[in-house]
Regions:
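C-terminal catalytic region of ATP-dependent kinase domains
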Residues: 66-70, 77, 117, 133-203
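Structural recognition of the beta-strand scaffold that forms the well-ordered cores
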Residues: 2-8, 34-37, 108-109, 127-129, ...
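Short, solvent-exposed loop/turn segments at the edges of secondary structure
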Residues: 2, 31, 123, 164-167
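Catalytic-loop signature of eukaryotic-like protein kinases
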Residues: 118, 123-132
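A generic fold-level signal
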Residues: 104, 121, 134-136
Length: 203
């Protein structure tokens, strides 16, 4: 009894998340690839990132690799501590966070979540991935889990929802450069895709 979906899952592969697959429990090159999820639950293998302005920590479940060496775990922890510090910086003209996160990928994910009114889109099932390399950035996506989509009857923004702790986006949206990126992403969508959406749906 219930509703079941047959769908692709999210995993590292050439036709899925196309990044270098990092070996489990390895010290070979801990810079990547990584596939992680900001998770609702702290039951799966994860690291915890302390969030001083939240009622709970940010739980980062690692999907690939699945088993971490001490060096892999240390690298992942350092990466997300650095992301937290850069995103929650008081100076919203800082570009430090852009050295860690792909801004336009985050803007695209934000537009999708906002259009879908997915209130828990930055609370759980919030995937990020990073390819191998010291200078590669974390890329938001792929999208997953729209169980609470179209459920926002308060006509507010998804990051402003007391029901769910929305991680990262509640401060990322305050950066003027991110706001401009969101305008550009939505403008491109409205100009190039929205006009032909009915035709696409009818195919």
């Amino acid at each position: 009894i219930g509703l079941y979906f047959l769908t692709e899952n999210i995993r590292v592969d050439a036709d899925r998340v196309n990044i270098t697959e990092q070996n489990d429990n390895s010290d070979e090159d801990v810079t990547g690839g990584w596939l992680v999820e900001v998770d609702n639950y702290n039951t799966d293998p994860h690291i915890s990132v302390t969030m001083s302005d939240k009622n709970q920590d940010m739980w980062i479940t690692y999907k690939s690799p699945e088993l971490l060496s001490a060096n892999q775990e240390s690298y992942l922890q350092q990466q997300f501590n650095a992301i937290r510090d850069a995103v929650y910086a008081t100076d919203k003209n800082s570009t430090e966070w852009e050295n860690l996160i792909d801004m336009y990928a985050m803007a695209r994910l934000y537009v999708v979540r906002e259009l879908m009114q997915d209130e828990e889109g930055f609370h759980g099932s919030f995937y990020l991935h990073k390819d191998r390399g010291a200078d590669t950035k974390w890329v938001a996506g792929p999208v997953w889990d729209f169980g609470n989509a179209y459920n926002n009857d308060r006509h507010s923004y998804i990051w402003d929802n007391p029901q769910f702790e929305c991680f990262l986006i509640d401060h990322i949206y305050q950066f003027p450069r991110f706001q401009e990126a969101v305008k550009n992403v939505f403008g491109d969508f409205y100009r190039d895709a929205y006009a032909s959406m009915d035709k696409f749906i009818d195919q």
